[in-house]
Amino acid sequence: RFESVDFHPRPGFNLVTGANGSGKTSLLEAIHLLAHARSFRGRVRDGLIRQGQPSLDVFAEWRDRTDTPHRAGLRHAGGDWEARLDGAPVSHLGQLCEAMAVVTFEPGSHALIDGGSEQRRRFLDWGLFHVERHLGDDGFLALWRRHARAHKQRNALLRQQADGAQLDAWEHELAQAGEALTRCRERYVVQLAPYVEAGMAELLPSAGGAAIALLPGWRRQELPLADALLLSRDRDRLLGHTSLGPHRAD
């Protein structure tokens, strides 16, 4: 929509107004793009470049909670991406995602309420990616990847009808990572709950209040994940995938 735009938001609430088609969404999309390395409109990267232009560029300056200044830039030209953070080249776009904590609500965000559980897990984990940096070993992202890898390996072994010894090793890893992942999600839901309740009371007072809680993806109050995986092993062999665990959380 724009050839060039400078936007200088103030701390706190900023309201962007304009007629239909004036570019309000394009402005928000640029901010989202810099923080997520993708558009909230799906896989439309090539369509983001203005017709007749070789590339798009997004640049931002901000200060974090310690008042430390930061600078980030992203360039997309055809199939190539180039990014810089605080003057240094970025080796992978995830570094921009980590540096900029941006949560976007757009027309498709209603899926958080009426969509499948995958949308809600993604929302939780995106928040945790930014707030659980104290975990060590690269923080929450490393834990999430550890769980995803173990989950993928167990599924592969189930499809191969692997023996118990092979499954034991990966179930141990999956259980350890899965329990830790679930504890992170539970803490985050507890932190989010007051904001959800206050927001609902203000926006929809007639609804009678709201509450959020985490369904961990297995009967966690009855048995640890390691035991649940062992008990479900025969059924999961028939299914060819893991039927319970944090990947089924809601």
Give residue spans per PLM region.
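Conserved NTPase motor "head" modules and their coupling/switch loops across ABC/AAA+ ATPases, GTPases
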Residues: 1-19, 32-33, 45, 75, ...
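Conserved glycine(s) of the Walker
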Residues: 23
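Nucleotide-state sensing region of NTPase/ATPase domains
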Residues: 32-119, 124-125, 131-136, 190-201, ...
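An accessory alpha-helical subdomain
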Residues: 108-204, 217
